[in-house]
């Protein structure tokens, strides 16, 4: 299964790179699928197939990878607009609402996505769900001095919340902004992502949460059909 998932991720990353045009300012996402996209971009720049590209990264991980591939970078504050942002997601529901933040980068990811003229999400088919938060926890970035208070208020919404602990250091995960992350699980999942995003962000001490609502223009889905990896494009319907 792992090999099939890798094939799906590679296929969708390659499809995303095909959307990149000369002269673009790009939002470069975080996570395993976005990393494959960044590698593909680096290869096309090195070969001369693409030129005059500038990237804006969403994490320290992406910044290091892009620098290794000699992709020119600018900070978010240094650009007036982003032509195209490409990023992964942890879950995508039928309304194109997302949960992101498995890598604790969702604050910068949301800033970049909001600045972009087009926001394209790249996922493998395992990330498509009927309802958010039934499988993947919702990350909430909080000020270190407020995490207990925020935890209580998240649990008052109906569910549980736990401080995310680091895997290879003692203590909690610390974000690129120096904050902590609470992972929330709501009873029955998230029925109204739009309302919940605002409700959580109104809690004092919360910097941002991992719900990305009404921001995605296209979802590229890597999937296996008859043993072969392919890509399906889901376009948002205009209301």
UniProtKB/Swiss-Prot annotation:
Signal peptide: none annotated. Catalyzes the reversible conversion of ribose-5-phosphate to ribulose 5-phosphate. Pathway: Carbohydrate degradation; pentose phosphate pathway; D-ribose 5-phosphate from D-ribulose 5-phosphate (non-oxidative stage): step 1/1. Its EC number is 5.3.1.6. GO terms for molecular function: ribose-5-phosphate isomerase activity. It is an enzyme of class 5 (isomerase). The active site is at 109 (proton acceptor). Belongs to the ribose 5-phosphate isomerase family. It comes from Synechococcus sp. (strain CC9605). GO terms for cellular component: cytosol. Homodimer. It catalyses: aldehydo-D-ribose 5-phosphate = D-ribulose 5-phosphate. It holds the Pfam family Rib_5-P_isom_A. This is Ribose-5-phosphate isomerase A. One of its GO terms (biological process) is pentose-phosphate shunt, non-oxidative branch. Keywords: Isomerase. Substrate binds at residues 30-33, 87-90, 100-103, 127.
